[in-house]
Each structure stands twice: as C-alpha cells, then as structure tokens.
Amino acid sequence: MRINPTTSGPGVSTLEKKNLGRIAQIIGPVLDVAFPPGKMPNIYNALVVKGRDTVGQQINVACEVQQLLGNNRVRAVAMSATDGLMRGMEVIDTGAPLSVPVGGATLGRIFNVLGEPVDNLGPVDTRTTSPIHRSAPAFIQLDTKLSIFETGIKVVDLLAPYRRGGKIGLFGGAGVGKTVLIMELINNIAKAHGGVSVFGGVGERTREGNDLYMEMKESGVINEQNIAESKVALVHGQMNEPPGARMRVGLTALTMAEYFRDVNEQDVLLFIDNIFRFVQAGSEVSALLGRMPSAVGYQPTLSTEMGSLQERITSTKEGSITSIQAVYVPADDLTDPAPATTFAHLDATTVLSRGLAAKGIYPAVDPLDSTSTMLQPRIVGEEHYETAQRVKQTSQRYKELQDIIAILGLDELSEEDRLTVARARKMERFLSQPFFVAEVFTGSPGKYVGLAETIRGFQLILSGELDGLPEQAFYLVGNIDEATAKAMKLELESNLKK
C-alpha cells in the first residue's frame, strides 16, 4: 500500500483557508469549539489555537476533533496542556488530520506526538509528512511468509520464538523487567538487524526515555557525529503528557514506521512501551467525552481503538514491520480487559512472572505462560520443537510437585520425581541470562546465545549428562559451556575453603 505523503503539515498552506471557530467551553484537556454554520470540521481534523494568555505568553495548542455535538459545535482533545486558554479564543481548522514528518530525516531524532523535534538539534530536514490516521493495508497486499526472528535470549528463542514481521507482546506487572527486556531486544536486534527501528514511548517514565536515548548514543544506534547514519527514530509521549498526546503518540510512531515499509520498502522494527498506557489514555479521553464506561471502567470502544492501531502493524509485499510491545498487566491480572484485548492481536506472548523475579531469575519469563504461534515442527524443525516441549513438560511436572515438596519435603518423592525436580531447577536457572543493558547493575558482561547453542544446552540437561553439577552453576550464564566452567570454578572454591 503506497502512502501519498503531503509536503506540508498542518500549520503551512492549509492554514491559509482560515476556517475559524471560537472556544465555547474548556474542561481540562477537552475543548468545545463553535464554528460558523456549514463550516464544521471533520472528525480527526487538527485544530490549532494560537494567541496569548493573560500574561502575554505565546499559546500554540494543537487539538483533534473527536465529536460533532450539533448546534455547530465540535468537541476536541488537546495534544498539549490547555493552560492559558480562554473562552472566545480563535481556533483554526487545518482541514486535515495531524501530520508528522516521515522518511530518513527522522532517524536519530526525538519527536513529540505532533512530530515536532524535542532534542534541541534544530528543525527536521524534510517537507514530507504523512497523516497519522490511515486505513490498514488491504488483504491482497499482506505477506504471509513465516520465518523466525532470533533474539539471542535463550528463553525466548527456545520456548516462544518471535516471528519476523509479527507482533510480540511482553506482559508483566509493575517492576518485573518489561522495559529492560525491550531495551535488551533493541540492543540485540537493532544492532544485528540492518534495517531501521522506530521506538514509541507511550505514557512511560521520562527517565527511561532519557536512559534509552543515552544508551543508543553510546552503542552507536544513534550516530551523534552523523545523524543521517542513525538507525532509529524515537517518539515520546510520556506520563506527564495530557491524555490526548498519550493516546495518539503510538499512531505517530506507527506512521513513521509505515513510511519506511511502504515507500522505502524496508524491514522495520517498531517498539512500543507501553501499549497499556495507550488504552489508559483512551479510557481517560472516553470519560472526558462523556461516554458510558464499559467493563472494569474501560472505554466502550476499547476493541475498536486497539484494532485500528494493531491492524496497521503488519507485513506487506513491500516490506515488514516487526512489532515488540510491552504490556503492563494491572494487579498481575491477565484477564483484565486491556491485556486480554491485546492478546488477540499477537503472534507471540512473553509473560513475565513476579514469582521468578522474586527468585532473582532474570529475564523473569514464565516458560509455561509464554506462547508463540511459531512453535510448530514444520516451522522450527523437529529438534527445536521436541526440546521445547520436553522443557515445558519438566517445568510443568516441577510445578505440580511443589505443593507436595512444601508439605512433605523433597525426601518423600520417588527417585524419578526427585530427578525431575533437580533437572527442572537447573533449567529454571539456565533460562536466566546476563543482559548487555544490565551490565551496570549486575557486574556481569551481557551474553548473546545463538539458537543452536540454546537447544544443545537444554538437551544436555534433559539427557542427564549434567546431573552431577550444582544448580547454581547454571545461574546467569550464557551457553552450557559457561555453566560447566562455572561448576568447576565453584568446586575449586569450595575445596579451597576446606
């Protein structure tokens, strides 16, 4: 599907038409605007309020039309703070949806929801813009090839492999490591992946956005000397922004990614942290617009809003968008409408467990809850599939035995079950891995483990060849050879202590 990019955003030639309205009412980030009869703007049109507040400060607020109220009034949601706005102020209808800069000039830059650079590096060197509201590609344009996307993270590649050009969700409650995992994936994939990446920070901490930017500059993903050679564009609408900005910033990032896919015909990585905040912002806006809340207080249009974003994230015959999305799980409840609605759109789900995080096993990926449509013998091969299934079966058996162990103790188990528990505990620890982005916290250098090495390691544990090694030797190591070397080191240390 080809985009027809325009060469002017709202605020250039479109403002010359001067379809003017006036503010009739302001309720927080929501404005009611009265227009002359027959001059009503369309839904999703961008409106601009320009003027001065009571102390003479310049005001420039962009809004998006959400409802037509009748009596020549529209209700719009502001994309920035509405401080200083007053009733009777002039509002300009731009006659088009919000448009943002697209193309190679966006790489290495940080944008807000309106596509304005916020990195103090001057204006963006492009006049090509694209509207943030577009329809999804038609069925006939979609690409259905199946291939695996290697991440270098053992637990992901073995148990819930990612699809190239697919949608992946990282589910987890507060503080279990979603953002660190996303940053590691950016580190591993964006470096190895020749194409471009777009990162959408939706309603997350400003500090994390800043850390990510600094890290990308250090690793060379953003080239400070020659910005044009950078590999990533960053779009941020953080926690302190009004709900309108948080609701639309995901679409801004997606629009930039779509241009690389459709016009430049590239394979693109789209990272979104956090898709729950997109839903949360939609819920806030829905309440402000006076809609009746639905299940658990969410907006009645939850599925539609999610679908309109997710259906545009897809692979076409021109290029692909592989999307990795962090999904906050409120109160660790996966049945909450926000994560539950997201599940339906994903090819792979990586579920992070608080129990594993509490044990200090990072990444805290739950081997039993995480799923992938790619884990089929015809796609990954018999050897990979068999190993993954045996790892899951052993983990499941260990989980079933935990109650018995808690009540009666390990000694009451049969010899076979004791062996299963010992191997499951080794595997649980072997699924942990030192991350490149966490080197400063852990003190251990990060490890990238290829898929073949991962499969070999788990086969050795399952076969019983490593039954004699202590389980702590498998904790936070890369491949299986490092685990055996660590076991020898531990044995040497214990002998010296004696």
Swiss-Prot record:
Positions contributing to ATP binding = 172-179
Q: Which GO terms describe its molecular function?
A: ATP binding; ATP hydrolysis activity; proton-transporting ATP synthase activity, rotational mechanism
Which enzyme type, at the first EC level? translocase
Q: How does it sit in the membrane?
A: Peripheral membrane protein
Which GO biological process entries does UniProt record here?
A: proton motive force-driven mitochondrial ATP synthesis
Q: How does it assemble?
A: F-type ATPases have 2 components, CF(1) - the catalytic core - and CF(0) - the membrane proton channel. CF(1) has five subunits: alpha(3), beta(3), gamma(1), delta(1), epsilon(1). CF(0) has four main subunits: a(1), b(1), b'(1) and c(9-12).
Name of the protein in its database record: ATP synthase subunit beta, chloroplastic
Task: Write the gene name.
Answer: atpB
